[in-house]
Swiss-Prot record:
Pathway linked to the protein: Secondary metabolite biosynthesis
GO molecular function, one term: 4-hydroxybenzoate polyprenyltransferase activity
Species: Emericella nidulans (strain FGSC A4 / ATCC 38163 / CBS 112.46 / NRRL 194 / M139)
Single GO cellular component term: mitochondrial inner membrane
Principal subcellular localisation of the protein: membrane
Pfam family, one: UbiA
Superkingdom to which the source organism belongs: Eukaryota
Leading EC class: transferase
Localization per record: Membrane
Protein name: Prenyltransferase pkfE
Bilayer topology: Multi-pass membrane protein
Loss of function: phenotype: Abolishes the production of Aspernidine A.
Amino acid sequence: MYSKSWILNALPAPLVPYCELTRVGYLPIGVLVSYLPVLVAILHVAAVARLPYDNILDSCLQWLPLCYVYSAYGCVVDDIADQDLDRKVERCQHRPLVRGAVSTTSACLFAASLASLAVFLTKTFFPDQPAVHIPVALAGSIIYPFLKRFTNFALLYLAFLYVATGLNASRTIGYDILSAPDHLLTSNLLLAAAVFIANVSVETIYMHADLEDDIKSGIGSLAVKIQGYSKPVLFLAAVAYGSLVLASGLAAEFGKWYFTGAITSALTLFTLVARVDLKNGKMCEQFFFMGNAVLMSLLAAGLYGECIA
């Protein structure tokens, strides 16, 4: 998972450690982890409101670089805060701050630059929209790494940030779902709950890659909390996810396109849980990144089908 990608190979050597801090150089698909919940939220509102195609496309394209920058900022902040913990976790000992390739001061300046870029892009793309997600995303990324030191449930907070960003993103296409008729608002909230559970599920799979190191180092995680009965908990989460996406579609009176995407997405999560070996760290990483992308993309595809049907 950590062999150098073509992105890193193409960069001048001094820039490589900074690209590594953002994780994008090693794992380009990682950007989708933050983007797809936003895409799902936008497409849901577009589908229920029957918005013009141009509005949908513009918003989806604008949020892609935004999610990239917010994700990069969060990764840098996480590495700054977790330096002492990363030294104790084998998978993280290659990171630039741990190996001394980037100083803490330089990393802080880099994070500040990314935060400034995120604010600039948000205000440029959506000058007339309330940017509530800006302080939520920026402050939330600072709070999250410290929660891991005090609780096993920091992941729930992270998943909430994804959902909250998606809700605010959906307002940038010119329709306020919070003012929609009750059945449409219900559909949106059910879908948000489903996305929350999906993110918690795949992130928990990912956290099993570091389970032994986390236990030895005293690092909190949901994987640590549910060790010994992880599979039953994840299966329950998969069932809950499937139930919520179906209920959301029924509330919004969606058609075959949505339900095709929703059902295949739910089956994907169930299959991930069934097939993953939680004691195989590499498999946990692969299932997290590829699984997250596939199950959220299927859900987004179903919603897109409703938009153009």
